[in-house]
């Protein structure tokens, strides 16, 4: 299988038309005619993930987040004076690693919709973007669950996503209509309100949006952008295997500890 075959098969499964207009998906750097020797699936395209790919014998780095949205002015070795994407592209070329990304087109997939609530044993009824059309691809997951307090839900999320979430709302409030949106909540809190959700689980949310939703009676749980989307790497890996890349040559890059919070004298 060539890199171009892998890219076209992935984009057939997660179409470009489902990506946001501003997004950068597909092959960013690499030789389309190179034979695929192995694929490392990673949330981000970083120097560390490139080197991890090489150490595993992989010449394709398949990521959720694009190496860039807008291309940097130059592609050079690492420097504090240039964006990190400049060095990543430079190093990818030097190492002969192709970088393919599936971003908002993956976010809108049925696989992504099922992924996050599935970690808690919940099923998505529809997307948050198109709540009245369960068959349509769309961002987010609208769910229903047995009544649970916001505090207990937050503990389950902490354990399932291995993170230290930020929670808005009364921990004793009972919720039963959660909605999930990996990454950044943005303006989708209003869609959650209109859809009748009573708690939104996301990666990150601005202070004023979280405060507003909380004051209107909705619980908000922010897991961390990266923690909320790391499960998507398994979707990428499964897609590669189903396309025909041998399972023994497909890997998932563990999420690095990029941020931390102090707790009881330790760092977690």
What is each residue range found by the language model?
Residues 1-268:
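Hydrophobic structural segments
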